Amino acid sequence: MDDLAGAAPENWYPRKTGMNPEATINDDRRFGGVTRLYGSDGAASLRRARICVVGIGGVGSWALEALARTGVGYLTAVDLDMVAESNTNRQIHALDDVYGKAKVEAMAERIAHINPACRVNCIEDFVTPENAANILDDGYDVVIDAIDQVRAKV
């Protein structure tokens, strides 16, 4: 697997998992389907990709997890909201043990169990017309707009 180390913003989530730290993760097994589908070069491109998902709700939470399961190496999650019980019917992170937790933090913890090599940058903020350029100008390959507030659409 490509080396994912390097300069990372200070707010990149420190990965915590319940996995045995002595355990070896076999990325060929874990992401072999991605390599078979997209080829070695495609899988390597995904490992190097920097993708930002803005809005970690009913669309964004599913998109963020799908990207992690595809082997994307760098993800940024942007949302200021907390996981609520009323999110359970539509948001992948809405589980009993995460109600009240920041959505971005809940997703970072979930992703650490799916793709431990993935670096997750958590930005606890809403995107507004005033801060959009600052949040979105970080060299992302792709930005996914999953915002539910029309005023914040950029």
Kindly give the residue locations of the regions a language model identified:
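A generic local structural motif
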Residues: 37-41, 64, 128-134
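N-terminal charged helix/coil linker that caps or initiates catalytic domains
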Residues: 2-52
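Short, glycine/charged-enriched secondary-structure capping and boundary segments
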Residues: 66-69, 90-93, 135-138
